[in-house]
Amino acid sequence: MSLGPMGMNTGFDINGMVSKIVSAERVPKQQRIDNERTNIDTSISAYGRLRESLDTMKNLMTQFRQEKAFAVRKVDTSNEQVVSATATTEAIAGNYSVDVLQLAQSHKIASEVLDKDAKFGPGKLHISLGDKSFTLDVQGNSKLVDIVRGINGEKSNPGVRASIINDVEGPRLIVASNVSGKDHSVKMSAQAEPGNPLKQLEYKTLEQRVRDLEKARAQAQQLIAPLTPEQQKVAAKVAEKIGDAARLVDQEVAQEIRSAAQSAQGAAGEALNAGELTESAVKAAANAASEAKKYIRPEDRIPGWTETASGTLLDSYWEPEEELDAQGQKKAADVPGWSNTASGTLLDSYVTPQEAQQKLEQKLAQEKAQIEAAIRSGKMTPEEAKAQARAKLSPEERAYIEQVEKAQAALNAAQSAFDGYGGMTEVQSAQDSMVVLDGVATLSSNNNIIENAIEGVNLTLKGKTDRNQPPAEIGIEYDRERVRNDIEQFVAAYNQFFQTSKELAGVDPRTGQAGPLAGDSIVRSADSRLKTVFSSSIEQAPENLKSLTEFGITTTRQGTLEINYAMLDRQLNNNFTKLGEFFGGNQGFAKRVEDAISSMTGVTGSIRTREKSLNEQTYRLDDDQRSLDRRMESLEKRTHAKFSAMQDATSKMQSQLAGMMNALGG
């Protein structure tokens, strides 16, 4: 700052002077707001800690008040690798043995090794899982990966998963069910021309193949010589018995395969080869067919049979001895009016359809030889030869030949499919889980969880019981340990509240500093209400369970709670089922503690009300702060304007004085 004439200042530090004036005005007011805000924030935090410690106790009491809080069961198992269990409150305490015979598993089939460059289609794959099915259209020249994607991406797929395994010899298609259980087996059939690789993706059991063959034979028989209703019934019985025999062979083969797979040494060498299996199936089918005669009704094989005379006839009737040779027996069945007395004449004079057919075939054979010679010499083509041969036949004969050819073609196709089956095979059977409970009850499920195996108990199966080990033991009992821990948590929660309230409302003996809630009546009231509940008697409880002291829970000289574990364990062991009468209900101990705490921490409780009041004070301080800021801003502007005006006036005065000095020659 420079001095002009007569010692007047030529300039002022206006900003510095304004800042000091405003600061002197702001500081005491700002300090009051800040101190009050700090006290409020400290109180809000203290009440929050107090409320949280009380709510912890309240939440524990809410659990105790649940209807089945003391009905929880504890489950132990002797072999967790075989079975585990969970129990609801409905489970009856006791010990049970569980023998796991088999685990549930999903069905899985696999193809033979396929050509890695194979082109499939055109055709269709019909795939079913249990009682649900879908059809996949396979375009011509499709790759194996295209089929896999088609199966897995089909929207109507009920739960079949396809994949490719790259064997050392080539790719294999694996198709498996996503659902376990015997009712969820996979079936696959292919609709394609013979020789199409798509036929390699069919899956048929031996039983199915036998039944298909018998069906084709029956259809062929119908085309050539339709069966009577009675013959159809007998044929159905025969087919059923043959199918049953094939199924038994299927089962024996499957058992052989499983045994071979489980054998430690020589498994491959002991397995049956394909030829032996086919021979076994054929023998079984032949034996079954030989017994089919017994299915013919008595009225069809016993002369003079009636309902009234059936008893006598069945007792006295002897099957007649065969009187004719094989050719005669074969012919006798077709001779109208045949009997033993007239057999010679009838058999000699009657020409059966079979004999007529033989003559026709001989004639056809001669003509066939002539036609073949003409074809070899080039006089006619095979098509012309066939047309010429058929033209010589009557319409009835042509129709008959066409029927025979059609039946023979169908039968050849069925026989070829049976003998040369090259489709998919089963690598894992579909089966339910199965256990034996307590050695008497057999239980099963389509998965490895058996619900309500024992009332209120679910079993989770993990492995089969070792043949050399005893069944797994499952023990179910009341969960006393959990209730004991809950009571310990309640006592710890109260002690935590007590320590927190003492810290917030007391005076630190080392520093002499009072807590943020020192002298607050709410803290004293909270502890007083809880102590009143703790010392009260629960009238609805049994005689020896009416107060906390009978659980061994008492108040120490310092004001905390402590547990006499000998008394607590005695009550848990002797009166476990009666604990709910003390803690539960609308008049029980747990509800009383809840109500006492709710009166403090609830929406209208004393602590909540105080917190609300403090929050409102915070809002008021915010208003005070904004008001102070506005006043200080206004003060700063006014003060700055005054000093600016003073500086202008001073400058003018100095200018005038300087002019006067110059005029006086000074």
UniProtKB/Swiss-Prot annotation:
Location of the protein in the cell: Secreted; Bacterial flagellum
Coiled coil: 354-419
Keywords, in A-Z order: Bacterial flagellum, Coiled coil, Secreted
InterPro entries given in the database record: Flagellin_hook_IN_motif, FliD, FliD_C, FliD_N
Principal location class: secreted
GO cellular component labels: bacterial-type flagellum filament cap; bacterial-type flagellum hook; extracellular region
BP-aspect Gene Ontology terms: bacterial-type flagellum-dependent cell motility; cell adhesion
UniProt-listed NCBIfam families: PRK08724.1
Job description of the protein: Required for the morphogenesis and for the elongation of the flagellar filament by facilitating polymerization of the flagellin monomers at the tip of growing filament. Forms a capping structure, which prevents flagellin subunits (transported through the central channel of the flagellum) from leaking out without polymerization at the distal end.
Family: Belongs to the FliD family.
Subunit composition and interactions: Homopentamer.
Name listed for the protein in its UniProt record: Flagellar hook-associated protein 2
Organism, as annotated: Vibrio cholerae serotype O1 (strain ATCC 39315 / El Tor Inaba N16961)
